[in-house]
Amino acid sequence: MAASSLAKFAEIEIDLGRYKGNYSYLKNNDRILPTEEEIIKYYWSIPNPLWQRAFGLMAAYGISNHELFYVDLDSLLEPPGHLISTYRKNHYGIRRIYCLCPEWYKEWELYKHIDLPQVTGQNNRDLGHRVSTAFRRYGLCKPGDLRHCWAIRAMGFIPDSMAARMMAHKTQVHNDTYKRWIDENDEDRFYQLLINRSDRPKPPTV
């Protein structure tokens, strides 16, 4: 692929080739993810400010439905708003997660301290179930969809290993999970990013 060659020349850590092939790793290959426009509409449709904040954090930072309750909200008080998570800290330490749509950090006022919904649960599955139930109640997408969208948004902008760490899983799991969503539109986007770099290879002037 042309985009793969350009990525190599521009020293960007993107290997588009690995996103082709067998997609059987996913349980549901027909899963349709919401567009960013739909995510924004979902956000503004939530009448409960606590659940609106929960949705906003999950959309902006790609955290899972139970990781929501392992984050340090005070870490968002100052820009650029890197979210601190202690989820799976025994494996990955305390992690910083980037908001890849900084406009959401500002427009949704994620820097303001608003409490999360008060939910109960004996384990992560219980906590996640409470979140999933709330999403269904408000007619939203699945919580995992927001996490998938963050991962796809990260492709081409940050190294896969860094994105995987932010999501608290291994790089191979990251690649196997999200490779199926690379399409021609993504390849075209990577191409535009690469050719607009000031340090890209250029032919000599004669």
Where are these regions (language model features)?
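Catalytic-site neighborhood detector that most strongly recognizes the C-terminal catalytic loop/helix
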Residues: 33, 89-91, 167-192
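Basic, Lys/Arg- and aromatic-enriched nucleic-acid-binding interface segment
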Residues: 20-65, 69
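C-terminal secondary-structure termini that scaffold catalytic or DNA-interacting sites
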Residues: 105, 112-116, 192-206
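N-terminal DNA-binding recognition helix of tyrosine site-specific recombinases/integrases
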Residues: 1-20, 63-66
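Conserved tyrosine-mediated DNA breakage-rejoining catalytic core shared by Y-recombinases
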Residues: 70-107
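Active-site/catalytic core of tyrosine-dependent DNA strand-transfer enzymes
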Residues: 99-150, 155
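C-terminal catalytic core of tyrosine-transesterase DNA break-rejoin enzymes
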Residues: 56, 60, 145-169
